């Protein structure tokens, strides 16, 4: 097993694939609520990039059911294999998200839940900058981030070693704005909306949920209206 962060994360998600699927299918999470915010802000049949798709549920499934054309990535080949078995119509790409390449302005939207905090935070700016460049004008990015200001966190997840890295809320917001995102909505919520059992791996954790728009768009108000924001 590799001792670099990406290797730690890949190894863990390869080996917990069945447990992880059962967990995401049963866990209380705001993720579907925020995915719908993305869909509501985009045109019909949008092109969407999902980073950290896991086995394809629930987010990839929701996006496809709503008519989106999705390119989905996960670092774990096992997770991608599981997603392919369920959703062969999606374009699924295994590997490190930092190695992805797309033409500028390829996607109407992007979505990434429980994923970006597995990157060393020294790589987060470059990754967010790439996502910004891949979005079309008026593109919308919905994501969540951790809120603990720690360069390296090593722990266990379903019995396997795991790596996390994060800025705090102010640091996350500043970084997104510096890259060129307008932050339309920012919420800091307890994992599972505070309804998790004590034995849940996310019990007691907080996450920052963000709806962001590629900056300097003349239609910002239209996006905000569709999301029910700024009223």
Write out the residue ranges for each language-model feature.
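A short acidic, Gly/Pro-enriched loop at the edge of an enzyme's catalytic core
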Residues: 98-110
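Class I SAM-dependent methyltransferase SAM/SAH-binding core
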Residues: 49-51, 55-99
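Conserved class I S-adenosyl-L-methionine
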Residues: 1-44, 149
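A short glycine-rich, Lys/Arg-flanked "PGG" loop and its adjoining helix->strand segment in the class I
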Residues: 125-137
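Conserved beta-strand signature within the Rossmann-like core of class I S-adenosyl-L-methionine
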Residues: 138-145
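Short alpha-helix
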Residues: 164-180
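Short, glycine-/aromatic-enriched active-site segment of Class I SAM-dependent methyltransferases
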Residues: 146-163
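Core SAM-dependent methyltransferase catalytic element
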Residues: 195-231
């Amino acid at each position: 097993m590799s001792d670099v962060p990406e290797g730690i994360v890949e190894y863990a998600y390869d080996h917990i694939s069945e447990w992880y699927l059962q967990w995401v299918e049963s866990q209380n999470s705001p993720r579907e609520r925020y995915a719908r915010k993305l869909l509501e802000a985009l045109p019909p049949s949008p092109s969407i990039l999902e980073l950290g798709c896991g086995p394809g549920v629930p987010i990839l499934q929701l996006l496809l059911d709503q008519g989106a054309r999705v390119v989905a990535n996960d670092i774990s080949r096992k997770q991608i294999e599981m997603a392919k078995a369920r959703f062969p119509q999606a374009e699924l790409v295994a590997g490190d998200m930092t190695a992805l390449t797309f033409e500028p302005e390829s996607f109407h939207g992007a979505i990434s839940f429980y994923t970006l905090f597995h990157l060393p935070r020294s790589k987060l700016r470059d990754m967010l900058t790439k996502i910004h460049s891949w979005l079309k004008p008026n593109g919308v990015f919905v994501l969540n981030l951790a809120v603990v200001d720690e360069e390296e966190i090593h722990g266990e997840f379903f019995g396997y070693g795991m790596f996390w890295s994060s800025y705090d809320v102010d640091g996350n917001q500043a970084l997104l704005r510096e890259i060129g995102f307008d932050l339309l909505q920012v919420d800091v919520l307890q994992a599972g909306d505070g309804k998790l059992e004590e034995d849940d791996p996310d019990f007691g954790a907080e996450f920052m949920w963000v709806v962001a728009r590629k900056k300097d768009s003349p239609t910002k108000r239209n996006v905000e209206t569709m999301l029910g924001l700024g009223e």
